[in-house]
C-alpha cells in the first residue's frame, strides 16, 4: 500500500507503474494523480491508446488488454467503478466472482507482457479483500486516497501560496480551512482567489480571507454560537440573517445548528467523563482539527444550557412541521430567549 505523498513523488519523477488500484474519498487528489499519468502519455487517442471501462463493459477488459496500441508504445486503460472489488454488482454473485477470477488469472499470467505495453488503472469507491486485490498489491500499486488531515492540507496549501510568492502565516491557513472546509478542490479554488488578489509578494491575512472567501454554513454556525456564548443577541441575529440573505435554505440552517449544538453537548459530556472527544463525535481524520474549537465553545455553555437549546430546536422543528411557526421567527426567538 502506497501513501498518497509517496505516489505523488513517484509520478513527479515520471515513474509510472503498469498496474494501479486507486480508491477512497479524497477525489481531488485521486483525479490529480490520474491527470499526471495521462499527461505522461502525451497524445491519447480514444479507442487506440486510451480505453475507458466501467461496470457495464468490464467483461471486455481482457480483449482490450490484448489489443495492441497501434502506432503507440503503450496503452492506458482506466477501469472506473467496475465493482470488481465489492459485493455490490449488477451481475449475479457467481458471475461476478467468475469474471473477477478470470481477470485476476489473466493479470497473473501476463504481468510481464502488461508491463511492456499497458498501464491499467482500476478506480473504485471502496474495495474489499479478494484475490485480484492481492495480485495488484503484489505486482502493482494500491493507493487509498483517504481524506487528508488538517496538517497535510495545511502543508499542501502553503506549498501553493509559496509557489506563487504569496505570503500567508500558518495560523491563517488554519483559519482558511476552518472557514471553507476540508474539500481540496474548494480550498484550492479559494486559494486561487486569494493569490490573484494579493499578487506576488503580497500578504494574505484574516481580513483578506473574510473579504474574498465563501464561508461554509458550518463555519458560520461557529460564529453564531460564539455570539450566543457572549450573549450578544444583535450579533447572533445578524449572523443568522446574513446566512438567510446568502440563500442558505432555512431547513439546512436548522439541521446544521441542531447538529452543532448536539456535538457541543457530546463534547461537554466526553470532557466530563475524560473520554476522547474526536472518537466521541465520530470525526473523520480531516475533521479532527475541529476538536479544539468545540472544546473552546463548550466553555461558554453549561451542560444544562446545551440540553435546553437542543430541546428548543427539536420543539421548533415540530412546530414548524405542523405549521405553527415560521422557522426564521423561531430561530430569532430562541436566540433572544437564550441571550436574555
Description of each model-found segment:
Residues 1-5, 12-23, 67, 74, ...:
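Helix-rich C-terminal "collar"/helical-bundle subdomain used as an assembly and partner-interaction module
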Residues 1-8, 12-13, 17-20, 27-223, ...:
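Non-catalytic interfacial helical region
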Residues 165, 224-225, 241-244:
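Short helix-to-loop capping/linker segments positioned immediately adjacent to catalytic or ligand/cofactor-binding
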Residues 199, 229, 244:
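Hydrophobic/aromatic-lined pockets within catalytic cores
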Residues 216, 224, 228-235:
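Short helix-adjacent coil turns
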Amino acid at each position: 500500500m502506497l501513501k498518497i505523498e509517496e505516489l505523488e513523488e513517484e509520478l513527479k519523477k515520471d515513474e509510472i507503474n503498469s498496474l494501479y488500484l486507486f480508491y477512497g474519498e479524497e477525489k481531488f487528489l485521486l483525479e490529480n494523480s490520474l491527470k499526471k499519468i495521462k499527461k505522461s502519455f502525451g497524445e491519447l487517442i480514444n479507442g487506440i491508446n486510451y480505453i475507458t471501462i466501467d461496470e457495464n463493459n468490464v467483461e471486455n477488459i481482457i480483449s482490450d488488454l490484448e489489443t495492441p496500441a497501434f502506432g503507440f508504445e503503450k496503452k492506458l486503460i482506466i477501469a472506473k467503478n467496475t465493482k470488481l472489488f465489492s459485493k455490490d454488482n449488477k451481475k449475479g454473485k457467481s458471475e461476478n466472482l467468475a469474471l473477477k477470477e478470470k481477470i485476476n488469472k489473466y493479470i497473473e499470467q501476463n504481468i510481464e507482457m502488461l508491463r511492456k505495453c499497458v498501464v491499467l488503472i482500476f478506480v473504485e469507491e471502496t474495495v474489499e479483500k479478494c484475490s485480484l486485490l492481492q495480485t495488484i498489491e503484489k505486482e502493482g500499486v494500491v493507493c487509498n486516497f483517504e481524506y487528508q488531515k488538517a496538517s497535510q492540507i495545511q502543508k499542501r496549501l502553503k506549498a501553493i501560496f509559496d509557489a506563487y510568492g504569496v505570503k500567508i502565516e500558518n495560523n491563517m491557513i488554519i483559519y482558511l480551512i476552518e472557514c471553507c472546509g476540508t474539500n481540496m478542490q474548494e480550498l484550492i479554488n479559494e486559494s486561487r482567489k486569494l493569490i490573484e488578489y494579493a499578487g506576488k509578494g503580497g500578504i494574505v491575512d484574516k481580513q483578506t480571507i473574510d473579504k474574498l472567501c465563501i464561508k461554509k454554513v458550518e463555519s458560520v454556525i461557529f460564529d453564531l454560537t460564539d455570539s450566543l456564548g457572549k450573549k450578544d443577541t444583535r450579533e447572533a441575529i445578524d449572523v443568522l440573517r446574513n446566512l438567510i440573505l446568502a440563500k442558505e435554505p432555512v431547513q439546512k440552517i436548522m439541521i446544521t445548528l441542531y447538529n452543532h449544538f448536539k456535538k457541543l453537548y457530546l463534547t461537554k459530556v466526553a470532557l466530563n467523563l475524560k473520554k476522547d472527544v474526536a472518537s466521541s463525535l465520530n470525526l473523520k481524520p480531516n475533521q479532527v482539527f475541529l476538536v479544539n474549537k468545540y472544546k473552546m465553545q463548550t466553555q461558554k455553555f453549561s451542560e444544562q444550557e446545551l440540553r435546553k437549546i437542543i430541546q428548543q430546536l427539536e420543539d421548533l422543528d415540530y412546530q414548524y412541521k405542523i405549521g405553527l411557526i415560521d422557522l426564521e421567527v423561531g430561530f430569532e426567538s430562541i436566540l433572544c430567549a437564550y441571550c436574555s
